[in-house]
From Swiss-Prot:
UniProt protein name: BPI fold-containing family A member 1
Disulfide pattern: C180-C224
Any GO CC annotation of this UniProt entry: extracellular region
Matches recorded under SUPFAM superfamilies: Bactericidal permeability-increasing protein, BPI
Pfam families recorded: LBP_BPI_CETP (PF01273)
Organism expressing this protein natively: Homo sapiens (Human)
Key word Signal present: yes
Expression sites by tissue: Highly expressed in lung, upper airways and nasopharyngeal regions, including trachea and nasal epithelium (at protein level). Specifically expressed in the secretory ducts and submucosal glands of tracheobronchial tissues (at protein level). Also expressed in the eye where it is detected in lacrimal gland, eyelid, conjunctiva and cornea (at protein level). Specifically localizes to epithelial cell layers in cornea, eyelid (basal epithelium) and conjunctiva (at protein level). Detected within acinar cells and ducts in the lacrimal and Meibomian glands (at protein level).
GO BP annotations listed: antibacterial humoral response; antimicrobial humoral immune response mediated by antimicrobial peptide; defense response to virus; immune response in nasopharyngeal-associated lymphoid tissue; innate immune response; multicellular organismal-level water homeostasis; negative regulation of single-species biofilm formation in or on host organism; regulation of sodium ion transmembrane transport
Compartment(s) where it occurs, according to its Swiss-Prot or TrEMBL record: Secreted
Keywords: Antibiotic, Antimicrobial, Disulfide bond, Glycoprotein, Immunity, Innate immunity, Lipid-binding, Secreted, Signal
Length: 256
């Protein structure tokens, strides 16, 4: 007759043995899936988001807002500042007959610089990226004549940066900056406030015309070198994943 105590001991030993074997490696010929690549690349949408986040963070940490705040607008507008006779001369000539002494404008101050959400599109052939960098600033035009601000303007401008994957002489592939320019038609200038007694509309129209001529290239010339610097400092893993997609023309910027 089989002893109950022996049965208990048998099952106890069996359970202990199975527990021990549970910690052993699974043989390679079994059909369980193997994790041969634990560090999987980001999904396409995740890759695009990681790129825009990295660029945005790099621009901010690289001093973009300070660059915008210190744009040398007054140096360009005042007499002798980069144009024949200076642009302020033409601007002030239209209103000084109404307001004597307005030629004493001494300051055009940039305030509240902003970097808005970056945009990203991919070329139809899949080999290029175009990053839209939307920027915002406020301009304050001051004069000692009235001891206050004449005008406050809100300005928005987009910079578009082309990103390419290129192969160097050592056959290494890098992300590089292609064309970097202001987006045509993206400059927006709006009046925030101005002193009522002054001929604001005439001053605004003249100043807007001048800013349309000089501001886009001024911003472009100061921001694009920083974009190039940020691009060279991107995380190597992120760069590798993006280069792989661009070289093979694979679409990973998903439009929703």
């Amino acid at each position: 007759m089989f002893q109950t105590g022996g049965l208990i001991v048998f099952y106890g030993l069996l359970a202990q043995t199975m527990a021990q074997f549970g910690g052993l490696p699974v043989p390679l010929d079994q059909t369980l899936p193997l994790n041969v690549n634990p560090a999987l690349p980001l999904s396409p949408t995740g890759l695009a988001g990681s790129l825009t986040n990295a660029l945005s963070n790099g621009l901010l940490s690289g001093g973009l807002l300070g660059i915008l705040e210190n744009l040398p607008l007054l140096d360009i507008l005042k007499p002798g500042g980069g144009t024949s006779g200076g642009l302020l001369g033409g601007l002030l000539g239209k209103v000084t007959s109404v307001i004597p002494g307005l030629n004493n404008i001494i300051d055009i101050k940039v305030t509240d610089p902003q970097l808005l959400e970056l945009g990203l599109v991919q070329s139809p052939d899949g080999h290029r990226l175009y990053v839209t960098i939307p920027l915002g600033i406020k301009l304050q035009v001051n004069t000692p004549l009235v001891g206050a601000s004449l005008l406050r303007l809100a300005v928005k401008l987009d910079i578009t940066a082309e990103i390419l994957a290129v192969r160097d002489k050592q056959e290494r592939i890098h992300l590089v900056l292609g064309d970097c320019t202001h987006s045509p038609g993206s400059l927006q200038i709006s009046l925030l406030d101005g002193l009522g007694p002054l001929p604001i509309q005439g001053l605004l129209d003249s100043l807007t015309g001048i800013l349309n001529k000089v501001l886009p290239e001024l911003v472009q010339g100061n921001v694009c070198p920083l974009v190039n610097e940020v691009l060279r400092g991107l995380d190597i893993t992120l760069v590798h994943d993006i280069v792989n997609m661009l070289i093979h023309g694979l679409q990973f910027v998903i439009k929703v």
